[in-house]
A protein has these predicted regions:
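Positively charged, low-complexity intrinsically disordered leader regions
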Residues: 3-12, 25-103
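A short, small-residue-rich loop immediately preceding and capping a beta-strand
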Residues: 82, 98-135, 222-235, 251-254, ...
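Claisen-condensing/thiolase-fold acyl-transfer catalytic domains that form or cleave C-C bonds
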Residues: 230, 234, 328-387, 391-393
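Active-site nucleophile and cofactor-binding loops and adjacent substrate-binding regions
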Residues: 77-88, 106-115, 162-163, 204, ...
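Short glycine/serine/threonine-rich phosphate/pyrophosphate-binding segments
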Residues: 88-94, 108-126, 140-143, 229-240, ...
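Active-site-proximal loop->helix
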Residues: 107, 115-173, 262-273, 381-390
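Active-site/ligand-binding loops adjacent to catalytic centers
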Residues: 170-195, 245-248, 253-344, 387-395
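Active-site/ligand-binding-proximal alpha/beta "capping" segment
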Residues: 180-230, 312-314, 333
Length: 395
């Protein structure tokens, strides 16, 4: 897709204070210098293969397919990456840029903790100091990931302001960056000011580069659907990237409907949001009546973000991607279904995408093919799911 510098259609741009803009210009310069550099690419691919364990399998979910009785379902197994999610794809790329910029300290925000864990690991690997900002609410929900980050030498800062979730962690991380302009900000999703959405796309496109090759090997044709969950949107951008030009492939992004789209307890930016500026970018976001970013909710700490990446906003308006939403309950049921039919425990974020496939597959012919991007594994969610089911049973 043609991108006017920093924009996807009307979306994107860079709405930040001047000191940050100067850093973004340096980052863009470094990225442009190295993104096609054979030595940089070789080093990046080396770490993807030998450190992260790529490529990840494209797995035919035979039992789930039989259970649903419709389209063939394949799972792109990003949960099998080192550390359990797609996040490391992007972090390795950004850390290698940081290294070339001679940075010694990295800052990151995290929601579910997966990006924080990936950043902590890469910082440990390359001998960098690491500070991770995480909403206090998410610290409680994702205690396991907090310990993982700390074990790898990162300092985790619990953010008590606002809704104490991902949006507040992003704000705090930007604040910390303003206070130490020599640090490198490793942004975890395809959001924020230019050039971050473009950089994250570049380092996540490996997902669909692999899945496209793999499905052609297995089925001799492209899929009919690719489905991925959308919070900020990095796993979905990676999963969709190489199919955007293939009009016959339907792309479906699944947001968090929380307690329902008719409540104020959701994070369905595309369905319920309007266009505005949030976190340095012009995109869709959920705003309150006062014009400020509204609190959002999801059982999933990785999806409760009130904005969305500008490239997704562009895909919505152009009609290339269909955006839908799944409730907490639908996501939990999908998580349990995949666990019981395939012995694969997906992250609660990924389970939103699985929930949509569960709705669609039975309505499709058996010769249709769906690829679901399983963006992460669900070990981190076991306690929260147990609490959810217990509370539901008590009602």
């Amino acid at each position: 897709m043609t991108e006017t510098k920093g924009y996807f259609g009307q979306f994107g741009g860079s709405f930040v204070p001047e000191p940050i803009q100067n850093l973004l210009n340096q980052l863009e310069e470094t990225f442009e210098q190295y993104k096609n550099d054979p030595e940089f690419i070789a080093e990046y691919k080396h770490y993807l293969k030998d450190y992260s364990g790529r490529e990840t399998p494209l797995y035919f979910a035979e039992s789930l397919t039989e259970h649903l009785g419709g389209a063939k379902i394949y799972l792109k197994r990003e949960d099998l990456n080192h550390l359990g999610s797609h996040k490391l794809n992007n972090v390795l790329g950004q850390i290698l840029l940081a290294k070339r910029m001679c940075k010694t300290r990295v800052i990151a925000e995290t929601g579910a903790g997966q990006h924080g864990v990936a950043t902590a690991a890469a910082a440990a690997k390359f001998g960098m100091a690491c500070d991770v900002y995480m909403g206090a609410e998410d610290v409680e929900r994702q205690r396991l990931n907090v310990f993982r980050m700390e074990m790898m030498g990162a300092t985790v800062h619990a953010v008590e302001t606002g809704t104490r979730t991902l949006k507040d962690a992003v704000d705090a991380a930007f604040g910390a960056w303003m206070a130490d302009l020599d640090a490198f900000y490793v942004l975890g999703s395809a959001v924020g000011p230019h050039p971050y959405p473009t950089i994250v796309h570049e380092f996540q496109k490996v997902i669909s580069e692999e899945s496209k090759r793999q499905i052609l090997e297995k089925e001799g044709r492209l899929p009919d659907y690719v489905i991925a969950c959308v919070g900020g949107g990095s796993n979905a951008i990676g999963a969709f990237s190489q199919y955007v030009g293939d009009e016959e492939v339907k792309l479906v992004g699944v947001e968090a409907a929380g307690h329902g789209l008719d409540t104020d307890q959701h994070a369905a930016t595309m369905t319920k949001g309007t266009v505005g500026v949030v976190d340095g970018m012009k995109t869709y976001a959920v705003f309150g009546e006062d014009g400020k970013v509204a609190p959002v909710y999801s059982i999933s700490a990785g999806l409760d973000y009130p904005g969305v990446g500008p490239e997704h906003a562009f895909f919505k308006d152009s009609g290339r991607v269909e955006y839908v939403a799944a409730t907490d309950d639908e996501a939990v049921q999908a998580l349990l279904l995949l666990s019981k039919t395939e012995g694969i425990l997906p992250a609660i974020e990924s389970s939103h995408a699985i929930a949509e496939a569960v709705k669609r597959a039975p309505q499709l012919n058996k010769d249709k093919i769906i690829i679901i991007n399983v963006s992460g594994r669900g070990d981190k969610d076991v306690a929260a799911i147990a609490d959810y089911l217990e509370a539901k049973a008590a009602k």
